[in-house]
Amino acid sequence: MLDIRLIRKEPKECESRLQKKDPAISLERLLDLDKTVRQLKADSEALLAKRKVLSGQIHKAKVANENADALIQEVNTIADQLVAFETTLQEQEALLEDLMARLPNYPDEDVPVSPDKTGNQVIKGHGEVPTFPFPPKHHMQLNEALQILDFKLPAKTTGSGWPAYCNEGVLLEWALLTYLLNKQQAHGFQLWLPPLLVKRDILFGSGQIPKFDGQYYRVEDGDQSLFLIPTAEVVLNGFHSQEILNEQDLPLCYAAFTPCFRREAGAGGAHERGLVRVHQFHKVEMFAFTTPEQEEVVYQKMLHVVEEILSELQLPYQLSLLSTGDMSFTAKKTIDAEVWLPGQKAFYEVSSISKCGDFQARRSETRYRDAQGKLHFVNTLNGSGLATPRLLVAILENYQQADGSVVIPSVLRPYMNNQEILLPKTVR
């Protein structure tokens, strides 16, 4: 949520900044509504003040045994007016709040302006894109012999886009997750296994609704709806909603492992088959609450963790600064870590590290008290640390051998009983 006071003070500047994300944004309707709401409040306060004066006059008239019928009639008229004002005020405030809730976060000044991902800027590359002395296979082709993933059986039970891991695929997935969690803990992140369902107001607080309403799986629990989380960011942000934290306790750096649920899987087209885009996947998510002064230090810490993981896995990757048209609704700055997928012949995002400023904190009402006792909204940051499906794809495709086997990265072997290679089923 943005600060309405800044919008009132600098409407043209705010509109210009927002249009870098969405050129269609106009603040005219919002400003008109804000003016109407403030006028209604002023008129209501004036009527309340007048009623107070009249009530005093009625009291004096009664004490003096004077006729107060006209005064009483005027007070009754004011009461009716106040009821009408309150109804109108509630309606107008609801419209204003909805418009405010649909405005995205302002992008930082150093974010490239572009309507889409074509404006993203590669700011760092690491490792060489592999060349193979044989025709490299897509991970789905490798899986035909390895048999570590199954798409047919879960399609019967659940539908397309819901893969199942099997055999050594289960071990490799858990090896990855254990390695990722150990890495987060080593860097000082507090580990969590949070709930997978959240209330609607928690989705609102993290910025998922109202803009993306209807894109999340919902579970009915009596008269209450709960939502399956699209990322642990949602629930971690909600942990401290409507709280006042102490400045000396910041930053709070959390890392959570959860399954994540996305309804839009498959939107990338048939070429993104397999694990590249699915409805359910595992992810380790980093999340932090900071002061504005701590924000950049924690941001660099998150970037460092992601780069360390990809470097230790010896995967070729690049860092891309996202343009305004490719950033999320809540982010003011995002850097994507992208790994090379030989099967796609392209770099694919495995982690997004974002600064959100006080945008989520305003929606969630999360503040901190400084040493002087003054209250401020916290800043929030989030970063994938990391999502495993594409990471698994990257390992399978970059570590593949001519015979269809796949070498297991050395950092994962301790979590797989020191197994060094995945062999095709026919040679086991």
From Swiss-Prot:
Its EC number is 6.1.1.11. It catalyses: tRNA(Ser) + L-serine + ATP = L-seryl-tRNA(Ser) + AMP + diphosphate + H(+); tRNA(Sec) + L-serine + ATP = L-seryl-tRNA(Sec) + AMP + diphosphate + H(+). It comes from Chlamydia trachomatis serovar D (strain ATCC VR-885 / DSM 19411 / UW-3/Cx). GO terms for biological process: selenocysteine biosynthetic process; seryl-tRNA aminoacylation. Consists of two distinct domains, a catalytic core and a N-terminal extension that is involved in tRNA binding. Pathway: Aminoacyl-tRNA biosynthesis; selenocysteinyl-tRNA(Sec) biosynthesis; L-seryl-tRNA(Sec) from L-serine and tRNA(Sec): step 1/1. One of its GO terms (molecular function) is ATP binding. ATP binds at residues 262-264, 278, 349-352. InterPro entries: aa-tRNA-synt_IIb, aa-tRNA-synth_II, aa-tRNA-synth_II/BPL/LPL, Ser-tRNA-ligase_type_1, Ser-tRNA-synth_1_N, SerRS_1_N_sf, SerRS_core, tRNA-bd_arm. This is Serine--tRNA ligase. It comes from the Bacteria. CDD domains: SerRS_core (cd00770). It is found in: Cytoplasm. GO terms for cellular component: cytoplasm. Homodimer. The tRNA molecule binds across the dimer. It holds the Pfam family tRNA-synt_2b. Keywords: Aminoacyl-tRNA synthetase, ATP-binding, Cytoplasm, Ligase, Nucleotide-binding, Protein biosynthesis. L-serine binds at residues 231-233, 285, 384. HAMAP family: Ser_tRNA_synth_type1. Catalyzes the attachment of serine to tRNA(Ser). Is also able to aminoacylate tRNA(Sec) with serine, to form the misacylated tRNA L-seryl-tRNA(Sec), which will be further converted into selenocysteinyl-tRNA(Sec). Belongs to the class-II aminoacyl-tRNA synthetase family. Type-1 seryl-tRNA synthetase subfamily.
